[in-house]
Amino acid sequence: MDPLARAGLTERDMDIQPTPGDISEMHASTPHDGRYAGYTRPLRGITSEYQSLKRRLGLEIEYLIALGDEFQHYTGPRPRLIDTPFTDGERRALRRVYEDFSEVDFVRFKKIEPKTDHDVVAMNILALYNMGDIVDAAVMERALHFGRTSSDMDSNVFSLTVQEIVGKYYMPAILGLQRMFIGKAEEWHRVPDGYPRPFTVIAGQTHEQYAVPTPLRKVMANIATELDQALDSFIVRGTEGEQPFRLYGKMGGAVGNDCAMMAAYPGYNWRDFYRRLIESQGLEYQPATDQDESNMRVLELFDAIRRANYPLLKWGDDYSSYLSRGVLTRKTRSEVRGSSIMPQKVNPWKTEGAEVFLEFANAELGVYGRLARQRKQGDLTRSALKRYIGVPMGNIGIAIGRFADDLGRTVPNYDGIETELAAHPEISAASTQMILRAAGVPGAYDLLVEATKGKRVTPEMMRDVVQGLVGGGRIDEATGSDVVAVFTHERNIGDAVERADEQLGQAMETVQRLERLYGIPSSV
């Protein structure tokens, strides 16, 4: 047999040459940029060193422009640092320095940095070089980065980066997966024509043992509810109503007291200027800092992200079980091979791998508690952590993508569901016992134990038990009918339908609110 035919390919398909992107991915030092690049590629536009430098350069220039405006209000004893505000043309030209930041600029930065051994100094040298003669060079050299420490820029850049990760990468992914959970709850509830039940019911398990029947829709609604409760943390409620999560920004010098700026230009309310500048960047100004802000809010955000991973980990556990029990099955193409040696298998390898990526992410995000432990008034242990943020968030993105891949090709296995239900009529025993106890039958629990001990429980056996109770006058015909009815499993699900309706409605409402708050286009 032609080996390519097994994969649905031909010789013509093999006539290919690698693209530069292919070569980059095949030689990547980590799976993020290699095997899993399809899941993490959007992060490159947010967390790469190139983007970090561009964002830092942008903040330096916006600070410079704002400083030019602010000095028009300064009436203190010293000459103004910038005598007149920048013109509209100068502002546009200055902003183009960071808006047009290119790969060539990045390489130039890398040429400068080893000489200075300081990334912020190197960036400012490049900024001055690229500004050229936009405005007076002496003014630029005097005013750029004036009164600032590196952390005044880097702390804000990190907060902006994290907010962009959440808004453009994480939130669209997690809300998309939540929509899938909600959609599968509805889709899997429906049954094919001719099916003996009006909706899909499975045998619920507790402690890995068969317990009571439950609609598959309610199973999925519970997953959606757990995730919904975690996602609620991303809605910040205050006096101004609901808001997206906003991180802190800081500007206060080396130890948070703004010593350098206030020494140079005393008697001026620089804090109000910083607040307006930071808020214009989309952050909330935090004046109470040392070299960095406390990072408590970013840790709160990371805790929320970690919590949202736990419902996904539960789903990963359950998904494998539902497949192995035959409750769910995956649609596969004819050329798909689930195992290299066992032809009967189609392994849930994407979901199983997703669980590992989430465990990595939760462990990595836990390390970020170090952000709150800087030595004395400041050190650079935080710097490495901040550069690393794409790794845990990339792991989460990979996991969400893999969960979605498997979920999208999964359907109920109706034959397997019915086989399991027929093999385990004991899932009606709890309701049977309660009906008998309510009817006043003494020792109802022990009666059922004795009737079924050591035997394979069948609906016919239970009907015999009921008929014996009716014939012996221990229960009336109506009670006997109620007992028999619970062996029709869709009639023995309590208020599951109503609860699922409520839960799924609440979960979808949260999705829509988060989409509005974070500016995410609705997928429906």
Each model region followed by its residue ranges:
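Amphipathic alpha-helix face/heptad-repeat signature
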Residues: 56, 116, 170-177, 216-223, ...
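Conserved helix-loop functional segments at active or binding sites
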Residues: 187-190, 233-236, 240, 279, ...
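Generic, well-ordered alpha-helical scaffold segments in large soluble proteins
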Residues: 63-70, 126, 130, 165, ...
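Long, amphipathic alpha-helical stalk/connector segments used for oligomerization, subunit docking
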Residues: 353, 357-443, 447
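A helix-coil-helix interface module used to build multimeric assemblies
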Residues: 2-239, 244-258, 265-274, 338, ...
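A conserved active-site cap/scaffold subdomain adjacent to cofactor or substrate pockets
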Residues: 290-396
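Glycine-rich cofactor-pocket loops
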Residues: 186-217, 329-345, 375-383, 408-423, ...
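Active-site-adjacent "gating/activation" loops or surface patches in catalytic cores
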Residues: 267-295
